[in-house]
Design a protein with these regions (language model features):
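Post-transcriptional modification and biogenesis factors for structured RNAs
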Residues: 1-169
Length: 169
């Protein structure tokens, strides 16, 4: 089974990080947060947005990008940026571990990082003259593309009605 790893590089907005944590809990993805952050981890907004799922969340913090790289030296990372040369759908996300990195809300990922990884830098297409999508929305789009490519492995396949049955005519 493929393990999805979401990497947030210096996130700034607690609500976004909380929503991303909730997406990770719902999909079984691991969350990696690279400091510095623009908020304290006990921020009420962060908890309200998603960290009440903390018991179902695999989360790790790193002092900086060098710390992350030292602990994951062989990670194949896909860098998400509005500046990328190709769409995220042009990639086949294979392997046992898939790492998806997203930058801070105000500036994205450092350009030198993108420049050093042209083959694994991707974007989510959107209309011209818009700066970017919301970070938590971008993460959800990317996570579900990886899951789709792996036939939603490990996720519940059907839903249930509370007052009715799908089998009733």
């Amino acid at each position: 089974m493929t393990k999805i790893n979401i990497i947030l590089h210096e996130p700034e907005i607690p609500q976004n990080t909380g929503n991303i944590a909730r997406t990770c809990a719902a999909t079984g993805a691991a969350l990696h947060i690279i400091r510095p952050m623009g908020f304290e981890i006990d921020d009420k907004k962060l908890k309200r947005a998603g960290l009440d799922y903390g018991h179902q969340l695999d989360i790790t913090y790193y002092d900086d990008l060098a710390d992350f790289n030292a602990k994951h030296p062989n990670a194949c990372i896909y860098y998400f940026s509005t500046k990328a040369p190709r769409a995220y759908t042009e990639i086949s996300y294979g392997g046992d571990n898939v790492y998806l990195m997203f930058g801070k809300e105000t500036r994205g990922l450092p350009e030198e990082l993108l420049h050093d990884h042209p083959d694994t830098t991707v974007r989510i297409p959107m209309r011209d003259k818009l700066r970017s999508l919301n970070l938590s929305n971008s993460v959800a789009i990317a996570v579900y593309e990886v899951l789709r490519q792996h036939a939603f492995e490990g996720l519940r396949e059907d839903g249930e009605l509370t007052r009715f049955s799908w089998n009733e005519g």
